[in-house]
């Protein structure tokens, strides 16, 4: 199969959705409708796919709906919608059609060896930056958040798999690696920080160890969705040393102790003390956050 640059050139469309907040749900529903109008053949996947009734009440003509990280299931539906032309002499080997080739980062031997189920298949960002997912899911039970229901509990990738992916991206021209997960600070907790191989070395699945290795690759390393765990201080020290970008995306969400308690979130005072300490270690630190007003 080939990735098409527009609806006009596509035989089917896969819509990757978000079901986290109402505007994202509406945007996803709108995108599904737009794709249906353009091609008539639409497969819906992603977070909103975990709530199929929400999709079917607005768009009952979608071809299929899957949940998050359902790559094999999505591809099964693609094959049903668009059977591949088979060559008589090569059996099940697909015949390549002329046209545009996607920019593909196929799972390599190292990914398979580490059981890496999150290895990307198609890179959709511009060449100069890329998102690198290090884990999927979340172990927290915040009162307001639907993520654990949509994404499940945290599953961390092996450090070796993450580093091999990052290495290939940088070798291919990527200048900035954006590290993402639902809870980046908790990376490796679920696998007890197990070690895996990267270029002949054993590396722990731990945020500090991962940051050290990523910082040696010659690209900007930007950390997203970092919560103020104690070990993040070590990561801030790496920032002060110029190893990774002095940037943290920290979702603090509110300043009221009463509201935070109702949200089942840590207290504001403790978080502010942590941030002050980070700034003492790395004065050039830039922090991005989101807050509820009211």
Please state what every model-predicted region is.
Residues 1-187, 206, 248, 269-277:
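Proteins enriched for Cys/Gly/acidic motifs involved in redox and nucleic-acid/cofactor modification
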Residues 42, 51-52, 171-294:
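Conserved SAM/AdoMet-binding glycine-rich loop
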């Amino acid at each position: 199969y080939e990735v098409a640059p527009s609806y006009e050139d596509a035989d089917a469309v896969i819509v990757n959705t978000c079901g986290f907040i109402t505007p994202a749900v509406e945007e996803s529903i709108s995108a599904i409708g737009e794709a249906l109008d353009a091609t008539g053949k639409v497969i819906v996947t992603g977070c909103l796919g975990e709530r199929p009734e929400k999709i079917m009440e607005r768009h009952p003509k979608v071809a299929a709906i899957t949940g998050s990280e359902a790559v094999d299931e999505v591809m099964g539906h693609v094959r049903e919608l668009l059977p591949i032309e088979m060559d008589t002499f090569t059996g099940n080997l697909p015949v390549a059609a002329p046209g545009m080739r996607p920019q593909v980062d196929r799972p390599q031997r190292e990914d398979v060896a580490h059981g890496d189920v999150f290895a990307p298949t198609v890179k959709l960002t511009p060449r100069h930056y890329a998102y690198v997912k290090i884990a999927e899911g979340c172990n927290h039970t915040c009162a307001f958040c639907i993520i654990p229901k949509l994404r499940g509990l945290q599953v961390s990738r092996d450090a070796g798999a993450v580093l091999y992916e990052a290495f290939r991206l940088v070798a291919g021209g990527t200048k900035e690696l954006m590290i993402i997960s639902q809870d980046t600070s908790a990376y490796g907790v679920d696998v007890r920080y197990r070690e895996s191989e990267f270029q002949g070395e054993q590396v722990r699945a731990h945020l500090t160890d991962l940051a050290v290795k990523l910082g040696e690759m010659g690209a900007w390393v930007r950390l997203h969705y970092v919560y103020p765990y104690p070990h993040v201080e070590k990561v801030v020290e790496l920032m002060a040393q110029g190893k990774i970008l002095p940037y943290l995306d920290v979702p603090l969400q509110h300043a009221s102790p009463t509201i935070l308690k109702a949200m089942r979130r840590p207290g504001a005072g403790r978080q502010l003390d942590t941030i002050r300490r980070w700034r003492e270690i790395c004065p050039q630190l830039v922090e991005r956050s989101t807050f509820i007003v009211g």
